[in-house]
Amino acid sequence: MKLLATPEIWFVCGSQHLYGPGPLKQVAANAQKVAAGLAASKKIPLKIVFKALLTTPDEITNLCIEANSDANCAGLILWMHTFSPAKMWIRGLSTLKKPFCHLHTQFNRDLPWGDIDMDFMNLNQAAHGDREAGFLHTRLRLNRKVVVGHWSDAEVQERIGAWVRAARAWHDWQGAKFARFGDNMRFVAVTEGDKVAAELRFGFSTNGYGVGDLVAKVASEGINDRHVDELCAEYEKRYAVAKELRRGGKRHDSLRYGARIELGLRTFLEEGSFKGFTTTFEDLHGLRQLPGLAVQRLMADGYGFGAEGDWKTAALLRAMKVMGEGLDGGTSFMEDYTYHMNPKGHQVLGAHMLEICSTIAATKPSLEIHPLGIGGKEDPVRLVFDAPAGPALNASLIDMGNRFRLLVNEVTAVKTPKLPKLPVARAVWECQPDFKTACAAWIYAGGAHHTGYSYSVTTEMLEDFANIAGIELAVINADTKLGEFKQTLRNNEVYYHLAQGIRV
């Protein structure tokens, strides 16, 4: 994946000097073993580093300051092996800017009932040491994830792994840049938003560039025939290229121009260190084709993308791709396009004009050329494929004016029916809990028609991500009841309006 860092997660253990040097030495040794056990887990995608045993307010504060200033630290895992009086943590945690996960565990899994004495009891106090810590975290109104269970438990490691993926995506957003070619599709509301508020809240910036900047890269002498030849040869190796597009075919020139768009767009993004971008078909002056194939391939390399100027979805898609890195399944830009409203089974056909990522292809994509019927340009080249059946989700990041909301709908993708006259990439899914409830809830929540669609990212990861970001999360799943969902939205309206004023 392009521009993807591999930061660390710091494992931090809390105690106090009350117990003396012997027990503290044992606490440190045990904490290192716990950290090593987590580091060895294949369910956790980043390196877990035992950082410190903290026993004084100054030690705690200094470590939090160090974490803030270390660009390679994506977050902390905190555990209180013994009782660690929480007032010692006030100053440090009040300064901490990195996300943290509170692991409520203990070193030993089973109690040695016949051998327990007071030395054992004093050493293994996480049961109440973590409660003391939890009170302070709650008193300080700190967003965090609490994971409960023995550190060797696969389910515990999986939950930590979900948080680590969210923390990595948050780390990736800090200082990230997204390029907007042109503006919004005209008169569209949901793709608008406050980019200043977004940078304050999320840490990434979005800035506009004239499509002429892209046109100049596409036409650049730095992209010569050899580069185009090599990329076209790669297309023929990776995809089932239509005969008319192959070398010697009557429309091979269209494929070569599509390759030029990819080379120019890739050069622009790499030179500017961008992690994502948007386009709009209403602002393509100087380009012969709508960028289709280029966008699909850049998404497959990890770039975020949003159509029609949708910068929030571009940023969200990048975050979701980071979260899902290394997992089975893929993640793509998506749009709810049209419905199958048969009473025997309601389904959604998801697609876009061209820009669906090939990481969600069920089989080898075909590379084709067809008229688009919108945009007024030459016929664009594009990858055509069906998405696979299986559990998936749609996620949408929207600007509510006074806050941001992350909306998630869990879905079940089904086998795509034959679509011989629809030459675009597509997915078909059934909504949870059902079509009518899910669509009504989505509309009540103000969800966009653009989403990040993923087979690899889970609701838990997105919940952790929203928690780190300090934004509202609304989930539509198999348990959703519309009346309760609407009331939750009303409650959230009040909570997020007041929350900043009651933090202390």
From Swiss-Prot:
**How does the cofactor attach, per the note?**
Binds 1 Mn(2+) ion per subunit.
Question: Keyword Zinc-finger: yes or no?
Answer: no
Example of a GO biological process term: L-arabinose catabolic process to xylulose 5-phosphate
Q: What is its EC number?
A: 5.3.1.4
UniProt GO cellular component terms: cytosol
Which is one Pfam family of this protein?
A: AraA_central
Reactions performed catalytically: beta-L-arabinopyranose = L-ribulose
Recorded metabolic or biological pathway in which this protein acts? Carbohydrate degradation; L-arabinose degradation via L-ribulose; D-xylulose 5-phosphate from L-arabinose (bacterial route): step 1/3
Which sites bind Mn(2+)?
A: E308, E335, H352, H450
Keyword Metal-binding assigned to the entry: answer is yes
Record's keyword terms, sorted: Arabinose catabolism, Carbohydrate metabolism, Isomerase, Manganese, Metal-binding
- Cofactor(s) essential for the protein: Mn(2+)
- State the Gene Ontology terms under molecular function: L-arabinose isomerase activity; manganese ion binding
Q: Which InterPro entries match?
A: Ara_Isoase_C, AraA_central, AraA_N, AraA_N_sf, Fuc/Ara_isomerase_C, Fucose_isomerase_N/cen_sf, Lara_isomerase
List the HAMAP family hit by this protein, alphabetically.
Arabinose_Isome
User: PANTHER family, alphabetically?
Assistant: L-ARABINOSE ISOMERASE
Per its database record, what is this protein's job? Catalyzes the conversion of L-arabinose to L-ribulose.
The family note in this entry says:
Belongs to the arabinose isomerase family.
Write the protein's name.
L-arabinose isomerase
Task: Tell me the organism.
Answer: Opitutus terrae (strain DSM 11246 / JCM 15787 / PB90-1)
Q: What is the lineage of its organism?
A: Bacteria, Pseudomonadati, Verrucomicrobiota, Opitutia, Opitutales
